[in-house]
Protein backbone atom coordinates (compact mmCIF):
# COMPACT_ATOMS: atom_id res chain seq x y z
CA UNK A 1 0.00 0.00 0.00
CA UNK A 2 1.41 3.36 -0.96
CA UNK A 3 1.50 5.96 1.80
CA UNK A 4 -1.53 8.26 1.55
CA UNK A 5 -0.71 11.76 0.42
CA UNK A 6 -2.08 14.84 2.12
CA UNK A 7 -2.91 17.83 -0.06
CA UNK A 8 -4.18 20.80 1.91
CA UNK A 9 -4.42 24.45 0.95
CA UNK A 10 -4.43 27.19 3.54
CA UNK A 11 -5.01 30.78 2.47
CA UNK A 12 -3.09 32.40 5.31
CA UNK A 13 -1.42 35.05 5.35
CA UNK A 14 26.63 31.44 2.76
CA UNK A 15 27.63 30.24 0.28
CA UNK A 16 31.05 29.06 1.57
CA UNK A 17 34.49 29.73 0.04
CA UNK A 18 36.34 26.94 1.83
CA UNK A 19 34.25 24.07 0.48
CA UNK A 20 35.91 21.32 -1.49
CA UNK A 21 35.20 20.75 -5.15
CA UNK A 22 32.40 18.31 -5.89
CA UNK A 23 33.79 14.84 -6.34
CA UNK A 24 31.93 11.79 -7.53
CA UNK A 25 32.56 8.62 -5.58
CA UNK A 26 32.54 5.48 -7.68
CA UNK A 27 30.16 2.87 -6.27
CA UNK A 28 31.89 0.11 -4.38
CA UNK A 29 29.71 -2.87 -3.54
CA UNK A 30 31.81 -5.47 -1.78
CA UNK A 31 28.75 -6.68 0.09
CA UNK A 32 25.11 -6.02 0.84
CA UNK A 33 23.52 -5.05 4.13
CA UNK A 34 20.12 -5.96 5.52
CA UNK A 35 18.00 -5.27 8.62
CA UNK A 36 18.45 -8.10 11.10
CA UNK A 37 15.39 -8.38 13.34
CA UNK A 38 16.24 -8.64 17.05
CA UNK A 39 12.84 -8.35 18.73
CA UNK A 40 9.30 -7.08 18.33
CA UNK A 41 6.22 -5.91 20.17
CA UNK A 42 2.53 -6.24 19.26
CA UNK A 43 0.00 -3.60 20.27
CA UNK A 44 -3.67 -4.59 20.03
CA UNK A 45 -7.19 -3.19 19.97
CA UNK A 46 -6.16 -0.01 18.19
CA UNK A 47 -8.68 1.89 16.10
CA UNK A 48 -6.68 4.38 14.05
CA UNK A 49 -6.58 5.42 10.42
CA UNK A 50 -2.83 6.05 10.11
CA UNK A 51 -1.08 4.39 13.04
CA UNK A 52 2.66 5.14 13.09
CA UNK A 53 5.43 4.50 15.59
CA UNK A 54 6.93 7.69 17.03
CA UNK A 55 9.69 6.52 19.35
CA UNK A 56 10.76 4.56 22.42
CA UNK A 57 11.46 6.73 25.44
CA UNK A 58 11.90 5.96 29.14
CA UNK A 59 10.48 2.45 28.81
CA UNK A 60 7.42 3.38 26.77
CA UNK A 61 6.48 3.08 23.10
CA UNK A 62 4.81 6.11 21.54
CA UNK A 63 2.49 5.93 18.54
CA UNK A 64 0.27 8.45 16.76
CA UNK A 65 -2.76 8.34 14.57
CA UNK A 66 -1.26 10.65 11.95
CA UNK A 67 -4.69 11.40 10.50
CA UNK A 68 -5.59 13.14 13.77
CA UNK A 69 -3.87 14.43 16.91
CA UNK A 70 -4.26 11.24 18.93
CA UNK A 71 -1.21 9.94 20.85
CA UNK A 72 -0.90 6.43 22.33
CA UNK A 73 1.54 5.24 25.02
CA UNK A 74 2.28 1.53 25.49
CA UNK A 75 4.42 -0.28 28.03
CA UNK A 76 7.03 -2.89 27.13
CA UNK A 77 4.42 -5.66 27.28
CA UNK A 78 2.38 -3.90 24.61
CA UNK A 79 -0.32 -2.75 27.04
CA UNK A 80 -1.92 0.64 26.50
CA UNK A 81 -1.10 2.92 29.45
CA UNK A 82 -2.42 6.25 28.17
CA UNK A 83 -3.98 7.96 25.17
CA UNK A 84 -5.01 11.54 24.48
CA UNK A 85 -5.54 14.03 21.69
CA UNK A 86 -5.16 17.72 20.99
CA UNK A 87 -8.06 18.25 18.62
CA UNK A 88 -10.20 21.35 18.49
CA UNK A 89 -9.63 24.78 19.95
CA UNK A 90 -7.42 23.77 22.87
CA UNK A 91 -3.96 24.90 24.05
CA UNK A 92 -1.20 22.99 22.29
CA UNK A 93 -3.47 21.81 19.50
CA UNK A 94 -1.93 20.12 16.48
CA UNK A 95 -3.30 18.30 13.47
CA UNK A 96 -2.46 15.88 10.69
CA UNK A 97 0.06 18.45 9.44
CA UNK A 98 2.24 17.84 12.51
CA UNK A 99 5.61 16.11 12.33
CA UNK A 100 6.64 12.97 14.13
CA UNK A 101 7.35 13.30 17.84
CA UNK A 102 10.81 14.12 19.22
CA UNK A 103 11.77 14.01 22.90
CA UNK A 104 13.64 16.75 24.75
CA UNK A 105 16.05 16.15 27.64
CA UNK A 106 13.18 16.47 30.16
CA UNK A 107 11.16 13.80 28.39
CA UNK A 108 8.67 16.24 26.88
CA UNK A 109 7.15 15.63 23.46
CA UNK A 110 8.12 18.09 20.73
CA UNK A 111 6.14 18.40 17.49
CA UNK A 112 6.24 20.79 14.58
CA UNK A 113 2.86 21.49 13.01
CA UNK A 114 3.59 23.49 9.87
CA UNK A 115 0.21 25.18 10.12
CA UNK A 116 0.08 25.67 13.91
CA UNK A 117 3.70 25.95 15.08
CA UNK A 118 5.95 24.10 17.53
CA UNK A 119 4.25 22.31 20.43
CA UNK A 120 6.08 21.08 23.53
CA UNK A 121 3.91 18.82 25.68
CA UNK A 122 4.33 16.65 28.73
CA UNK A 123 3.64 12.94 28.39
CA UNK A 124 0.17 13.48 29.87
CA UNK A 125 -0.55 16.18 27.21
CA UNK A 126 -0.06 19.21 29.49
CA UNK A 127 1.32 22.16 27.54
CA UNK A 128 4.88 23.34 28.21
CA UNK A 129 5.20 25.70 25.23
CA UNK A 130 2.76 26.57 22.45
CA UNK A 131 4.74 28.49 19.83
CA UNK A 132 3.27 30.03 16.69
CA UNK A 133 4.48 28.95 13.26
CA UNK A 134 7.48 30.88 11.90
CA UNK A 135 5.79 31.65 8.59
CA UNK A 136 2.30 30.88 7.32
CA UNK A 137 2.22 28.19 4.65
CA UNK A 138 0.21 28.21 1.45
CA UNK A 139 0.19 24.50 0.70
CA UNK A 140 1.38 21.13 1.89
CA UNK A 141 2.16 17.83 0.26
CA UNK A 142 3.84 14.98 2.09
CA UNK A 143 3.56 11.26 2.73
CA UNK A 144 2.93 9.70 6.12
CA UNK A 145 6.18 8.11 7.22
CA UNK A 146 8.38 6.94 10.07
CA UNK A 147 11.09 9.16 8.59
CA UNK A 148 11.59 12.44 10.43
CA UNK A 149 11.53 15.79 8.65
CA UNK A 150 12.98 17.66 11.65
CA UNK A 151 15.56 16.99 14.36
CA UNK A 152 15.90 18.04 17.99
CA UNK A 153 19.52 18.85 18.81
CA UNK A 154 21.60 20.20 21.69
CA UNK A 155 24.31 22.84 21.31
CA UNK A 156 26.15 24.34 24.27
CA UNK A 157 23.54 23.01 26.69
CA UNK A 158 20.55 24.48 24.84
CA UNK A 159 17.97 22.58 22.82
CA UNK A 160 16.94 23.52 19.31
CA UNK A 161 14.66 22.16 16.64
CA UNK A 162 16.06 22.19 13.11
CA UNK A 163 13.57 21.94 10.27
CA UNK A 164 12.45 23.56 7.06
CA UNK A 165 9.28 25.11 5.66
CA UNK A 166 8.26 25.61 2.05
CA UNK A 167 7.48 29.26 2.73
CA UNK A 168 10.25 30.80 4.83
CA UNK A 169 10.37 34.33 3.46
CA UNK A 170 7.50 36.82 3.33
CA UNK A 171 5.11 35.54 0.68
CA UNK A 172 4.92 38.09 -2.16
CA UNK A 173 4.10 35.80 -5.12
CA UNK A 174 7.33 36.67 -6.97
CA UNK A 175 9.24 33.52 -7.91
CA UNK A 176 12.45 33.86 -9.89
CA UNK A 177 16.15 32.86 -9.73
CA UNK A 178 16.87 35.82 -7.45
CA UNK A 179 14.42 34.38 -4.93
CA UNK A 180 16.35 31.10 -4.89
CA UNK A 181 19.71 32.89 -4.67
CA UNK A 182 18.52 34.73 -1.54
CA UNK A 183 16.75 31.82 0.06
CA UNK A 184 18.01 30.14 3.23
CA UNK A 185 16.65 26.65 3.65
CA UNK A 186 17.06 25.55 7.26
CA UNK A 187 15.36 26.98 10.35
CA UNK A 188 16.79 26.63 13.85
CA UNK A 189 14.39 27.38 16.72
CA UNK A 190 15.36 27.80 20.38
CA UNK A 191 12.91 25.58 22.27
CA UNK A 192 12.85 27.88 25.29
CA UNK A 193 12.28 31.21 23.56
CA UNK A 194 11.02 30.37 20.04
CA UNK A 195 13.80 32.57 18.65
CA UNK A 196 14.37 31.31 15.12
CA UNK A 197 17.32 31.79 12.79
CA UNK A 198 17.69 30.98 9.10
CA UNK A 199 20.70 29.05 7.79
CA UNK A 200 21.99 27.23 4.68
CA UNK A 201 21.66 29.06 1.37
CA UNK A 202 22.04 26.97 -1.76
CA UNK A 203 25.80 26.32 -2.06
CA UNK A 204 27.79 27.53 -5.04
CA UNK A 205 27.39 25.05 -7.89
CA UNK A 206 24.02 23.81 -6.67
CA UNK A 207 21.46 22.84 -9.27
CA UNK A 208 19.08 25.42 -7.79
CA UNK A 209 21.31 28.33 -8.81
CA UNK A 210 21.17 27.51 -12.53
CA UNK A 211 18.71 30.28 -13.42
CA UNK A 212 15.63 28.04 -13.49
CA UNK A 213 12.81 27.59 -10.94
CA UNK A 214 11.56 24.43 -9.24
CA UNK A 215 8.60 22.96 -7.45
CA UNK A 216 8.99 23.51 -3.75
CA UNK A 217 9.16 19.78 -3.00
CA UNK A 218 12.38 19.72 -5.04
CA UNK A 219 13.95 22.31 -2.74
CA UNK A 220 13.24 20.60 0.56
CA UNK A 221 16.41 19.85 2.56
CA UNK A 222 16.93 16.34 3.94
CA UNK A 223 19.43 16.41 6.78
CA UNK A 224 21.02 14.82 9.84
CA UNK A 225 23.10 16.55 12.50
CA UNK A 226 25.69 14.56 14.47
CA UNK A 227 26.24 16.11 17.90
CA UNK A 228 29.49 14.24 18.56
CA UNK A 229 31.34 15.49 15.48
CA UNK A 230 29.24 18.68 15.16
CA UNK A 231 28.73 17.87 11.50
CA UNK A 232 25.54 18.57 9.56
CA UNK A 233 24.88 16.25 6.60
CA UNK A 234 22.41 17.71 4.13
CA UNK A 235 20.99 16.95 0.70
CA UNK A 236 18.24 18.68 -1.25
CA UNK A 237 15.38 16.49 -2.37
CA UNK A 238 16.04 16.48 -6.12
CA UNK A 239 19.82 16.81 -6.04
CA UNK A 240 22.17 13.81 -5.43
CA UNK A 241 24.84 15.93 -3.72
CA UNK A 242 25.81 15.33 -0.10
CA UNK A 243 26.83 18.57 1.59
CA UNK A 244 28.79 18.38 4.84
CA UNK A 245 28.89 21.36 7.21
CA UNK A 246 31.03 22.05 10.24
CA UNK A 247 28.59 23.34 12.83
CA UNK A 248 30.96 23.76 15.76
CA UNK A 249 30.29 27.51 15.72
CA UNK A 250 27.13 29.54 15.58
CA UNK A 251 26.72 29.17 11.81
CA UNK A 252 27.13 25.99 9.72
CA UNK A 253 30.16 26.23 7.42
CA UNK A 254 30.32 24.13 4.26
CA UNK A 255 33.44 21.94 4.26
CA UNK A 256 32.69 19.26 1.66
CA UNK A 257 30.27 18.37 -1.13
CA UNK A 258 30.13 15.11 -3.06
CA UNK A 259 27.89 13.89 -5.84
CA UNK A 260 26.72 10.42 -4.88
CA UNK A 261 26.42 7.65 -7.50
CA UNK A 262 22.80 6.73 -6.73
CA UNK A 263 21.65 4.20 -9.30
CA UNK A 264 18.62 5.40 -11.26
CA UNK A 265 18.69 8.93 -9.85
CA UNK A 266 17.92 11.45 -12.60
CA UNK A 267 18.60 15.15 -12.16
CA UNK A 268 15.85 17.54 -13.22
CA UNK A 269 17.11 20.82 -14.69
CA UNK A 270 14.15 22.97 -13.67
CA UNK A 271 11.48 25.12 -15.34
CA UNK A 272 11.75 28.43 -17.11
CA UNK A 273 10.71 31.43 -15.01
CA UNK A 274 6.94 31.88 -15.17
CA UNK A 275 6.18 28.25 -15.99
CA UNK A 276 5.21 27.46 -12.39
CA UNK A 277 3.92 29.51 -9.49
CA UNK A 278 5.42 30.32 -6.12
CA UNK A 279 4.68 27.64 -3.53
CA UNK A 280 3.60 24.87 -5.92
CA UNK A 281 4.60 21.48 -4.54
CA UNK A 282 4.56 19.34 -7.64
CA UNK A 283 2.54 18.09 -10.60
CA UNK A 284 2.65 14.55 -11.95
CA UNK A 285 1.84 15.74 -15.47
CA UNK A 286 4.96 17.90 -15.68
CA UNK A 287 7.21 16.08 -13.20
CA UNK A 288 6.30 12.35 -13.32
CA UNK A 289 8.17 9.80 -11.21
CA UNK A 290 10.72 12.32 -9.89
CA UNK A 291 14.01 11.13 -8.41
CA UNK A 292 13.94 12.11 -4.74
CA UNK A 293 16.21 12.02 -1.74
CA UNK A 294 13.84 10.75 0.95
CA UNK A 295 15.82 10.39 4.17
CA UNK A 296 19.25 10.58 5.77
CA UNK A 297 19.91 8.76 9.06
CA UNK A 298 23.16 8.50 10.99
CA UNK A 299 24.01 4.87 11.76
CA UNK A 300 27.23 4.51 13.72
CA UNK A 301 29.88 6.40 11.75
CA UNK A 302 28.00 5.97 8.47
CA UNK A 303 24.89 7.34 6.77
CA UNK A 304 21.79 5.47 5.66
CA UNK A 305 20.45 7.33 2.62
CA UNK A 306 17.05 6.49 1.15
CA UNK A 307 15.94 7.71 -2.26
CA UNK A 308 13.53 6.96 -5.08
CA UNK A 309 14.84 6.54 -8.66
CA UNK A 310 13.13 7.45 -11.93
CA UNK A 311 12.09 4.63 -14.30
CA UNK A 312 14.12 4.47 -17.51
CA UNK A 313 11.25 3.76 -19.94
CA UNK A 314 10.36 7.29 -21.11
CA UNK A 315 7.77 6.16 -23.66
CA UNK A 316 5.92 4.22 -20.96
CA UNK A 317 5.93 7.31 -18.74
CA UNK A 318 4.53 9.38 -21.61
CA UNK A 319 1.71 6.87 -22.06
CA UNK A 320 0.88 7.06 -18.35
CA UNK A 321 0.72 10.87 -18.51
CA UNK A 322 -1.52 10.69 -21.59
CA UNK A 323 -3.84 8.20 -19.90
CA UNK A 324 -3.04 5.53 -22.49
CA UNK A 325 -1.11 3.07 -20.36
CA UNK A 326 -2.11 -0.39 -19.24
CA UNK A 327 -2.39 -1.31 -15.58
CA UNK A 328 0.57 -3.65 -16.03
CA UNK A 329 2.76 -0.77 -17.21
CA UNK A 330 1.71 1.42 -14.28
CA UNK A 331 2.54 -1.38 -11.85
CA UNK A 332 5.93 -1.91 -13.49
CA UNK A 333 6.82 1.78 -13.32
CA UNK A 334 5.75 2.02 -9.68
CA UNK A 335 7.96 -0.94 -8.89
CA UNK A 336 10.93 0.61 -10.70
CA UNK A 337 10.39 3.85 -8.75
CA UNK A 338 10.28 2.14 -5.35
CA UNK A 339 12.48 3.49 -2.59
CA UNK A 340 16.05 2.22 -2.34
CA UNK A 341 18.44 2.57 0.58
CA UNK A 342 22.23 2.62 0.59
CA UNK A 343 24.85 2.81 3.30
CA UNK A 344 27.33 5.58 2.68
CA UNK A 345 30.50 4.74 4.60
CA UNK A 346 32.94 7.27 5.99
CA UNK A 347 35.42 6.40 3.23
CA UNK A 348 32.82 7.26 0.57
CA UNK A 349 31.86 3.70 -0.36
CA UNK A 350 28.22 3.21 -1.31
CA UNK A 351 26.79 -0.18 -0.29
CA UNK A 352 23.22 -1.33 -1.09
CA UNK A 353 20.84 -2.22 1.73
CA UNK A 354 18.11 -4.83 1.31
CA UNK A 355 14.93 -3.63 2.99
CA UNK A 356 12.22 -5.82 4.53
CA UNK A 357 8.57 -5.21 3.77
CA UNK A 358 7.67 -2.19 5.86
CA UNK A 359 4.46 -0.39 6.72
CA UNK A 360 4.54 3.09 5.12
CA UNK A 361 7.78 2.06 3.41
CA UNK A 362 9.93 3.76 6.04
CA UNK A 363 11.95 3.16 9.19
CA UNK A 364 13.34 5.05 12.17
CA UNK A 365 16.93 5.00 13.45
CA UNK A 366 17.71 5.67 17.12
CA UNK A 367 21.41 5.25 17.83
CA UNK A 368 22.28 1.81 16.47
CA UNK A 369 18.69 0.54 16.64
CA UNK A 370 16.46 0.48 13.57
CA UNK A 371 12.66 0.36 14.01
CA UNK A 372 10.12 -0.58 11.38
CA UNK A 373 6.49 -1.74 11.35
CA UNK A 374 5.03 -4.91 9.90
CA UNK A 375 2.90 -4.38 6.84
CA UNK A 376 -0.69 -5.41 7.71
CA UNK A 377 -2.87 -7.58 5.50
CA UNK A 378 -4.39 -5.11 2.99
CA UNK A 379 -7.60 -7.17 2.90
CA UNK A 380 -8.19 -6.93 6.65
CA UNK A 381 -8.96 -3.89 8.79
CA UNK A 382 -5.98 -3.81 11.14
CA UNK A 383 -6.58 -3.49 14.88
CA UNK A 384 -3.20 -4.80 15.97
CA UNK A 385 0.21 -3.66 14.83
CA UNK A 386 3.68 -5.17 15.07
CA UNK A 387 6.78 -3.08 15.67
CA UNK A 388 10.15 -4.66 14.89
CA UNK A 389 13.58 -3.45 15.86
CA UNK A 390 17.00 -4.63 14.86
CA UNK A 391 20.36 -3.64 13.47
CA UNK A 392 22.24 -3.44 10.21
CA UNK A 393 24.10 -6.59 9.23
CA UNK A 394 26.35 -7.49 6.32
CA UNK A 395 25.36 -10.48 4.21
Put a short name on every predicted segment:
Residues 23-49, 346-353:
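A short helix->beta-strand "capping" segment at the edge of beta-propeller domains
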Residues 36-43, 84-94, 131-146, 196-216, ...:
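Surface-exposed loop and turn segments in beta-propeller and other repeat-based domains
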Residues 39-70, 293-308, 313-315:
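Beta-strand-rich domains and repeat architectures in extracellular enzymes and scaffolds
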Residues 50-56, 99-104, 148-158, 217-228, ...:
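Structural signature of eukaryotic scaffold interfaces centered on beta-propeller domains
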Residues 80-108, 113-115, 131-140, 357-359:
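Blade-loop segments of beta-propeller domains
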Residues 116-117, 123-177:
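Asp-box/WD-like beta-propeller blade repeats and closely related beta-sheet repeat scaffolds
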Residues 287-344:
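Loop/turn-rich, solvent-exposed surfaces of beta-rich toroidal or solenoidal domains
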Amino acid sequence: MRPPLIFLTAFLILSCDNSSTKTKQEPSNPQTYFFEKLDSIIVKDVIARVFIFQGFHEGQYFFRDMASSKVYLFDQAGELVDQWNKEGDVPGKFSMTASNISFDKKGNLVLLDIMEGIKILKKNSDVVHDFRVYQNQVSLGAAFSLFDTEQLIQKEGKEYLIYSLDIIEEYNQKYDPEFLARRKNLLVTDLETNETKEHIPFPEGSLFLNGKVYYFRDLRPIFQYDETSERLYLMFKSEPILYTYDWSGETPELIDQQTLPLEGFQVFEGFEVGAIDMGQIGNFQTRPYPSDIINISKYGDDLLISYSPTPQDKSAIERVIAGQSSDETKIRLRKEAQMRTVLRRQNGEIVPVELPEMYYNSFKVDGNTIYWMKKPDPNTEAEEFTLYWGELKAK
